[in-house]
């Protein structure tokens, strides 16, 4: 340390066959939940002397594939994808990837996955809203193409309402993008109908 010597990362990579780099692909860098996830990833990687290369995709599945391909061709030891949805192109990449991939937030048989109980969360939310509501209930969600945050949460929400003797009536459901602005627009649409 006194001499200022720093070992060459390229020499270490040649010697150990490891880059000690993990590519992390996230849908939105400025999302609170994604910030927490990336902070947790960085903490664990740092404890193991790994570094993170971070790429944001602005909720665009095609960009997820683009960045995973970039990282696959860069000397990374693995990729972590916080996925928006798993498309046929995602499955193809995951089946053929030369580096290990972990998917967070979605389920696929082609990678190790860490995902939440979106159905259970939606159901708990449906029960809680039904217990406090005296009027009509509305739901704003993302596209059902997103099997986790879209389909599973909506199905769980509807089940929670049903268990509480309520239902989501026609016209009280809106599909939004995964942004606060889009959610706000859908609230205004509901209020103006």
Predicted regions and their residues:
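Short hydrophobic/charged patches on amphipathic alpha-helices used for structural packing
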Residues: 11, 65-68, 91, 126, ...
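Amphipathic helical "hinge" segments at domain boundaries
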Residues: 5-78
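Hinge/beta->alpha junction and helix N-cap segments in small-molecule ligand-binding domains
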Residues: 27-36, 54-63, 114-124, 140-162, ...
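Non-catalytic positions within long, well-ordered alpha-helices that form the structural scaffold/packing
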Residues: 65, 72, 130, 191-192
């Amino acid at each position: 340390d006194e001499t200022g010597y720093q070992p060459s990362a390229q020499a270490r990579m040649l010697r150990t066959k490891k880059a000690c780099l993990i590519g992390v692909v996230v849908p939105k860098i400025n999302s609170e939940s994604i910030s927490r996830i990336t902070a947790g990833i960085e903490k664990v990687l740092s404890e193991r002397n790994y570094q993170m290369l971070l790429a944001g995709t602005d909720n665009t599945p095609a960009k997820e594939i683009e960045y995973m391909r970039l990282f696959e061709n860069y000397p990374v030891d693995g990729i972590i994808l916080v996925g928006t949805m798993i498309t046929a192109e995602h499955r193809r990449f995951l089946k053929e990837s030369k580096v290990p991939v972990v998917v967070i937030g979605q389920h696929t048989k082609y990678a190790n996955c860490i995902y939440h109980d979106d159905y259970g969360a939606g159901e708990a939310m449906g029960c809680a809203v039904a217990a406090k509501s005296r009027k009509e209930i509305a739901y704003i969600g993302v596209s059902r193409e997103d099997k986790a945050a879209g389909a599973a949460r909506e199905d769980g929400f509807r089940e929670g309402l049903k268990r509480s003797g309520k239902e989501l009536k026609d016209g009280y459901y809106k599909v939004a993008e995964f942004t606060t602005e889009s959610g706000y627009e859908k609230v205004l649409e509901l209020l103006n109908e």
